Amino acid sequence: MSKSFKLHSVFKPAGDQPEAIRKLEEGLENGLAHQTLLGVTGSGKTFTVANVIADLNRPTMILAPNKTLAAQLYGEMKEFFPDNAVEYFVSYYDYYQPEAYVPSSDTFIEKDASVNEHIEQMRLSATKALLERRDVVVVASVSAIYGLGVPDLYLKMMLHLTRGMIIDQRSILRRLSELQYSRNDQVFQRGTFRVRGEVIDIFPAESDEWALRVELFDEEVERLSIFDPLTGQLQHEVPRFTVYPKTHYVTPRERILQAMEEIKVELAERRQVLLANNKLLEEQRLSQRTQFDLEMMNELGYCSGIENYSRYLSGRGPGEAPPTLFDYLPADGLLIVDESHVTIPQIGGMYKGDRSRKETLVEYGFRLPSALDNRPMRFEEFEALAPQTIYVSATPGKYELEKSGGDIIEQVVRPTGLLDPLIEVRPVATQVDDLLSEIRIRAAINERVLVTTLTKRMAEDLTDYLSEHGAKVRYLHSDIDTVERVEIIRDLRLGEFDVLVGINLLREGLDMPEVSLVAILDADKEGFLRSERSLIQTIGRAARNLNGKAILYGDRITASMEKAIGETERRRAKQQAYNEERRIIPQGLNKKIGDILQLGQPSMRGKGKGRGSHKMADTTQYQSLSPKALDQKIRELEAKMYTYAQNLEFEQAAELRDQVHQLRQQFIAIS
């Protein structure tokens, strides 16, 4: 029986939180399909959502617009629910180049990808948790709308082992091979098994810290035990165990054979169409490529690019929605769309980009038309599949407002009593010199400044100018990778420099309580960077500081500026009235620095001897590494760890294990 959610927090709901929690729960219990939580920056939206999840006790999926915010949410949810299953589901590609054809230059680009094993393990862990228990929170990126294995086939492939079960060793080994586990008696790692006499050790694909030992006696399962794969130490015995497939895309042999026959029929039909249109080159290319794939599938059970035949492998009809993570979420599940004004348009845009690339491949004979069904969900399909949904944003979009029927749940008053920033509009003519004097005032009292410009060129020039005039300044732009971006934000908070200049990167989800001033240059130039929503989000970056202030430089007040200023002043007035009524004195936030990089660390390892008692490994020397270099370092340390274990030097191996664990958490946060 699955346990209930248990929320761990030193805080109690305060400000607008209790009312928001009550209204959200009331709406969900009354069967409302869509609700919108308009929560200002720093009002504790994540804490409100965590309370709703804990009170209603329903499996939940949280959709975030990017990996950085997903990692931040995952870390926060792990702290709120350390005793429950908090899982992480994002794209497992470190690098991905889809196959494509460029007709103008007659260039075919082969698919090339690099899979991150640790994130793959976390994805498998997420689906396992959804299938086995109800106290689950899965934090996902838009990767959740892409095709996954069919839950029914995935469940059918599982290997159930029970103490006392009559089964011979060969049958277990054959079933493990069908699940795509490989035998490796030398190096015991995730997704492998080893055999020693009548003992089979299995390292589950969804685990990174424990393995299963199956002990047989005369074709009977005598004992099932969980053990530490590194030290070999037995932890406890279990009466039964389910081994899940190594990949979501595993398919039974009979289904593969059936799919092959269906592919042959489609190939024959497509060849006739191409020949009728005198496309001889395309016909030859398609026949050659498809026949090769069919031979590979017959011999090995899979082929390169097998996902292009997913319609047949999953038994779907033409145009049917692909199976996704949403198919694993129970019918009474809950969906939270974080920063919905960004996430919802993303979901709508994924299908169209994918479709145009594949249509070219089909037209020129690189793929069968059925490859078009290997795709992300369409927006209508997402709407049809989504369970009860809460949209969370400081600036909800039109879609969320329409779906919620205009009935918005506001969370404007912060538990800390902090007010929205004061806003001033100043002329453009003197904006740079005026900004420089404001920076000097802030730097003198150890506060930070964010500056947002319209173009990359302007950001670079401004950075040079401020630097020449003695300001400690850095520039954040799209060419900087995620790890560097996290490092720059961390350095800003630590006071390594005082001013951060950016274009469109200083918006959703960046928690920087040290920032007391946000300067928006050329605020009167209407456009998506200076829309009402963008302005409110950017102004909100100063809302976590006691002295928060926003300066908008413009020679006129545009409609967007007027709306953004009006909305901010409305919120500020409401917050002020609440504070005066209850005699609340605003308090500054004291958020730990490096939260994202320390992803999920408070829950370091489970129970049992030696697990939770290890000292925190020192990984500071690796914090400046790029994702690629960090991945290489993890592999090196893992190789050393296994060498120590084989030499029975378990203390050194355990130290490296903890170090690897922390570096993996860091890798997730920055990739």
UniProtKB/Swiss-Prot annotation:
Pfam families: Helicase_C, ResIII, UVR, UvrB, UvrB_inter. It is found in: Cytoplasm. Residues 631-666 form the UVR domain. GO terms for biological process: nucleotide-excision repair; SOS response. Keywords: ATP-binding, Cytoplasm, DNA damage, DNA excision, DNA repair, Excision nuclease, Helicase, Hydrolase, Nucleotide-binding, SOS response. SUPFAM superfamilies: C-terminal UvrC-binding domain of UvrB, P-loop containing nucleoside triphosphate hydrolases. A motif (Beta-hairpin) lies at residues 92-115. Residues 26-183 form the Helicase ATP-binding domain. Residues 431-593 form the Helicase C-terminal domain. InterPro entries: Helicase/UvrB_N, Helicase_ATP-bd, Helicase_C-like, P-loop_NTPase, UVR_dom, UVR_dom_sf, UvrB, UvrB_inter. One of its GO terms (cellular component) is cytoplasm. The keyword Iron does not apply. ATP binds at G39, V40, T41, G42, S43, G44, K45, T46. One of its GO terms (molecular function) is ATP hydrolysis activity. The beta-hairpin motif is involved in DNA binding. Belongs to the UvrB family. The UvrABC repair system catalyzes the recognition and processing of DNA lesions. A damage recognition complex composed of 2 UvrA and 2 UvrB subunits scans DNA for abnormalities. Upon binding of the UvrA(2)B(2) complex to a putative damaged site, the DNA wraps around one UvrB monomer. DNA wrap is dependent on ATP binding by UvrB and probably causes local melting of the DNA helix, facilitating insertion of UvrB beta-hairpin between the DNA strands. Then UvrB probes one DNA strand for the presence of a lesion. This is UvrABC system protein B. The lineage of its organism: Bacteria, Pseudomonadati, Pseudomonadota, Gammaproteobacteria, Enterobacterales.
